[in-house]
Every structure is written in C-alpha cells, then in structure tokens.
Amino acid sequence: MKKLLIAFCFSLLASGMQAQADTTLQGSVRYLLTHNWTKKMAAVDYLSQQSRERIAYMWGKRSEWKEYTTLYFSPAVSRYEESEERAEADDMGYSWRREPLSLRRDFDKGSLSDYITMASKTYWVEDTLVPQHWKIHNDLKEVAGHVCMKATWEDTLKKQKVVAWFAQDIPLQAGPERFCGLPGLILEADLNDGALLISADRIIMRRMGKELDHPKKIKAKKVKEEQYTQAIRKYMDERRKEEEPYFWGMRY
C-alpha cells in the first residue's frame, strides 16, 4: 500500500510538471520578414545582365519589403501563417494579395500538413515530418530577449544557405516557414546572407486552442512531399527558361 501511495504521489508530481510545461511552453511568435530584392536577384545565377537591369528598373529604389507572420506553438504541435498585421504602409497604391498559407507540424505523430501556394496553385502537402539536417555551431547571440545558438543548413534545390538561431530556453522543435527540428524554438532565420531575414520581434506565452488547427475550407490539391518537391523543381526549370526569378511565384 505504501509503495502504491508513493507511486501515486510521483504520478501527481509528474502530471503537475507536465501541466506546467504544457502551459508555459505554449504561445505565439510574431516574425518580421524583411525581403531584400537586390540580394535575392544576386543569388539567381541564371539571369542575364539585361534581365537584371530590367527588373532593377521595375523595382526602382524600393529594394526591401517587410511583412509579419505568426507561429502558434505547443510542445506537441505548431502552426505557421501570414499575419493580418501590416509591417509597413503600402505606398505602392495597392495591397498584396494574401495567398493561402498554413504550415502545421505534429511533433508527437511525426507528421506535417501544409497548405502552401505556388504559381497561383494551392497545394495540401501531407506526409511524414522530415526535419532539415542542421549543423549546430557554438556561436551565441540574443534574439527577442533570448540567448540563441546558431545552426546552419543548405537548401540544394533552391540554392539557399540558411543560418538559424534557436532559443535553448524554449526547448521546442518548431520554427518559421518550413524550418523545424532543432532542440529549441527557432527565433531567427537568415537566407542567403540577408536576401530574406526572418526575425522574432514579439513572443506571447499563453495556452493555445484552435489556433493550432488549420483554417476551414481551403481548396487545394493534396500531394505528398516528393510530389510537391517535383512541382517546385518543374516550376523553377520553367522560370529558368523564361529568365524570370523563381521567387516571384513561390515562397523564397
């Protein structure tokens, strides 16, 4: 009887600790995305000088564009989407059309479920979750008030070098865009030396509910990860032939 009582006490303690962890490790992150068109263009190796000059003329002096995104997270699940908040005034006379984006990770089940748009076509990618193969470094820096450790990964399909910074004091695998799999919440990601900088600027810890679920009624073509990768490769090949930047029709 005494052993059962001790076991029960330990069970209550463990449950209490788990409940506390579930509460304290839930919340949302607002990320500021800074797109640098000049650096994005420089990373596209197939454009002729004439194409570069034409595109540079079209964009004029506006080399940067900023937007907000939001990541909702818990120990088991995360979901990432574009934010309703505006990061800057739209001084070009029109608003950017928001396309369906909802990237969901279930870390307990090891699965992903992503609604993502490419070339005006929305895909519903459902498959096993395979995180990026990160290399962790000893470098440290502060992001949004948290001491973060550096990790790197190279996207060989899009030819992007990614530098991520993850918070060791928030031991979750989640991150912005399709990044995940580090031993801490990813608070910053730098793609191709500033071509796209994703940086957390607000973290709110609170219990999550329906925020972790996909929005309803998203029309999309259901595919596996490999099929989506093939679609990316095909689209990039088409853009190469047309001498147009691939990132105009898909997420960078």
Language-model segments: which ranges?
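Extended soluble regions of mature proteins
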Residues: 21-252
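Bacterial Sec-dependent N-terminal signal peptides
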Residues: 1-24, 250-252
